[in-house]
C-alpha cells in the first residue's frame, strides 16, 4: 500500500505546489471542485440541472399562468406566444403544467433518492462491517427485493391514504406515499453494492492497521470505510435519482401513480402518448425534460465520482 | 351525430345485401383466416364463470342461446324455429310459463344431438348455489325448467312475468352441453379447465387453442347448422396491449381485421381512420355516463352505519333547485365533443335506448344556462360570497365529486368543476382506482355503492332491450345500506312513492305500447326530479378492416352475433 | 465454500417462506375486488356469490396454508409431469386464478417463452454491449470514445422505455412498416422464414431493452474498471513487463467484474417477471403482462404465485452472486 491510500481521504496530501505556500491549507472541497470543473460533461450537467431547478421553482413566478385553467376554445393548439408549448385537450397551458409537473417529478426524484440512499448505505455498511448483522440484514434485503412495487403501492394507498390526506391534503398525501414507496423499494441495490465493497475494504491493510491501533468501529466506518465507498454510493445516487423519476412516470403510465388531474412529467407524457402522431410535442416535451434531468444528474454524478476519488484527483 | 348513426345502419344494411346475394358462391371456409384483437384479452370461454363483456363476446361464436337480439333490438329465433309469444301460444295466458321448441337436427360441434335436457342442465348449472354463476339473475323468478320431450322446454315462473325472455336469451344465457359439464357443477366448476377453455357449442366456431389472457384460436365448426357457413375457416382472437395499439393495428398497419372497444380521444381516432385501411363501427345502446346525486348526507361526522343512509337527508342536495342548477351549469354537447366525439351523444335521459323508449321530453337540458342556474341558487337562499363561493347561514356551498380513475373522467371532472365554480359552488375532486370504486367490498369506504361523496360519476347500462329491471333499481328500499351489506342498486338513495307505484304498473303490464309509455313516464319522473344528471350516451366502438364484409354492429347482443356471415372482400 | 453455500441454501428456505407469508398477508389487506371489473349489469348479490365461489370465505391463515401446499407440492408436480410426460401429477386442487379460473402454473408456463425471448435476449444483448463499452471507456478515460460512449449510455438510461417504445413503434412500425407492432405468441420457429419473422417481431422490444440494460451495466463496468486501473497490482503487473492486453483483459477485467457480476446476477430475476412496461407497449403477453393485468383485476392468486416465484429467483440469484464473489475474489473469506 502506498502512502496515499493509507491516508484517509478526508486529508489528502497537500499538492506539491502548496508546500512552500504560507497560506492555511485549502479546504478539501476546493480540490473536489477543481477536479469537478475539469469534467466538461459534469459542468454542463450542473448548468442544465440548475436551469431545470430554476425552471420548476422560479418559472411559475415569471410565467404566471394557472396550470389548471381550462380554456376550451383554445384547446389542442400548437406553440404560440400565448402558449409557448401549446395547449392540451382541455386548453390548459402546457408550459405552466410542465413547470408544476416538474416540481413534483424533481421533488419525487430527489427525496426518494435521498431516503433510499440513506437507508441503503446504512444497511450496507452495517451488514458488511458487523458480521453478526450480515445475515439478518441481507435476508431483509432479499425480502425487500422480492416485494413487488405495484401491489405494495396499492396496499399503501388504501392503508394510509385517508390518514395522509387528512394530515397533509390530497396532493401532499399522494406525494409522500409515492416517495416512501419508491424509497422503500429502491434502497436494496445500494445496500448490496455498499456491503460488497465494505466486505472487500475491511480486509484491506489500512483498515487492519487502523483497527490494530485501537480505532473504534464507528470511527473506522466514518473515517476509513465510508469515504472509500463514496464512489459506488455516488454512482448509486445518480442511478437512484434517475430511477425514482422514471419509476414515478412508469407508475403514472400504469395508472397507479399520481392521478390524472395532478400534472407530473410522467403523467403529462402518458396523457400525450395517444396524441403522438398529431401533436408529437406533447410527448416530446415531457420526454425531453425527464431525459435531460436524468442525463444532467448522471453527468454530475460522473464528475463527482472522479472528483471525490483521491486516487484520481490530482492525477 | 344522429345522422351518423342512421348512416351506420344504412351501411350495415348495404353490407347485408351483397352478403345474401353472394351467399351461393361463398362456401364454408372460403374466406380463409381472420385476425381480431381485443386489447383486454379473453380470460375464459365459460361466460357463466366470468361475466365480462369480452368473454361473452368471445364465447358467443361458440355457445349460443335459444334466441337473441338482432342489430335493431328485435328478438330473433336462433336455436328454435320461432320465438314463443302470447299470440302463438308459446307464452301461457297467465304469463307464468314459456315453451321453447328446439329446431330439428341441431348438433353439438362434437357431432352429438342437442336435446332439451341440455337446456335443463344449463339452468341447473347456473343456479347451483355454490357455482357463483355470473348470469344467475337471468334465472331470477324461475321456478323450474323442464324437458317435455327431446325438443321441448317449459320454463315456469313463480309470478306472472310480462318479459319471459331472460332465461336462454341473448349472449349472456347460452346453452352448454350436459355431457361436457355434468361433473363440473357447483364448487367443481372452476376445476374443469379444459371444458371452460374449450366448451362444446352449437355456434359457427370451435376453440382449437386457448391461452388465457393472451390468444384464442378458432376453427369452423364442421357440424354447424348452415352448411355454407361460416365463411372464415380460422380465426385468431388476439389480446393485449392498449386501445391505441389495437386501433393502429386495424387502421394503420393492417395487421388486424377487427378491434374491439376503442375508447380513444375523438381526434386520435379520426387521425388513425385517415389511414384508410379500416372503418369505425359505432352504435348506441343503453350505456350512459351520468352524475349521481346523493340524497343522503355522506358527512364523515355521522357515525358509521348512519352515514349516507336515508336517516340523514342531504343538507344541500335535497333541494331540487340546487340539483337543477347543477344540471343547468353543465354543457353536455361540449363534454361529448371532448370526451367521446362521434362515439357519444349528449343526453338528458335515464333510459337512452332502445330508440322507441328514449323520452323526447327532456332535451331542454342540452343547452347550458349559467344565468338560470345562478337564479335558482339565489332562490334557494344561497348567497354569493366575496370569494365567488355561495354561502347560506354561514355554510359554504361545497361538494365532494368522486369518480373512478380514468383520463376522460378526470377531464370531465375538471370541466364540471370549472362550470360549477361559475355558479358559486366549490367542488373538491377525488378519483378512486376503478378496482376499488366499482368493487362491492362492504369494508371499503370508497365504493360507488357506499357513495361517501356528494356527487359521483360513472357509466351504467342494462342488458337486453327491456329496461324494467333497470328502472326497478331506483325504487325506495333498493338503496345500498348497512342492513344489506351495502348491496343494492339505488345508488343515489332516491325515494318516491309515485315512482314505485308506476314501476309496479310497468311490471304487470304485458301490452308493449303501454309499456313504452310507462317507461317514458318513469324516465321523465326520474330525470325531471334531477335525481341524477345524465351526461353522455356512449356508443359501442369497434373498428373493422375494409377488407372484411358482413359485419353488423349490434349493441343488444354480442358484437359477434353474426360471425358466421363475415367474409373477406376479394380485391 | 461448499459449506458456506449449503448454509446459505438452508437459510434460503425460511427466507422464502417468510416472504411468501408477508406477500400473502399484504395482498389479503389490499383493496380491490375481483368482481369490480365486471359490467354493472351484474347485480351485487350475484357478485357476492361469485366472491364466495372464489373461496374467499376461509380465514386468511387457512388459505395461506392451502396455497402453500399447492404451491410447493401440487404445482411443481404438474409442471414436471407436463415437461416429462411422467404421470406424477399430485391429485387435489391446484392454484386457480380468479380471473381465468384455471391453474396459475399452466399460465406461467405458457407465458415463459415469450418473456425469455424478448426480455432475456434484451438482457443478454445488453450485457454483451455493455462490457466492451465499459472496458474501453474506462481504459481510454476522457477520450472521444469514452465521451461518446458515456453520452450514448447516459441517453439510453435517461430516456424512459415507454418513451423510446412509443417512438420506435411510430417510426418503424407505422411509418416505415418494417416490424409488426404486436407480438404473435402462437408463432413457432420452424424454418428460416419463420425465424426471420421471429427476429422481426422481437427486434423492437429487444432493442429498447438492450439499450436500457446496456446503459445501466456499462456505467457499473466503467466505474469498476476505473477503480481497478489505478490499483497498485496493475502497476506491479505492468512493471513486471506483462503485455498491456494481458494486464487489462486478464487482471483488471477479472477484478472489475466482481461488482458487475453482482449487478448482473441481481438483475436476472427481472428477466423472468419481465419488463412490464416494454411488454405492455409492444403487446408481448409475457409474465410481466400477466402480473400487471392480474393486479388490475385483483387476481390475487396469480399475483401471489408470480411474486413467490420472483422471490425464489431473487434469493437464488443473490446466493449465486455471493458465491461468484467468493470465487472471483479470493480476498473475501466467508467462513
Task: Please state what every model-predicted region is.
Chain B
Residues 22-27, 68-71, 83, 88-89, ...:
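Extracytoplasmic/periplasmic ligand-capture domains
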Residues 535:
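Active-site-proximal polar cores
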Residues 9-19:
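Bacterial N-terminal signal peptides
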Residues 34-91, 124, 200-204:
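N-terminal lobe/hinge region of extracytoplasmic solute-binding protein
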Residues 39-60, 79-80, 164-174, 202, ...:
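A structural "hinge/loop" feature
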Residues 29, 135-185, 209:
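Surface-exposed binding/hinge segments that line
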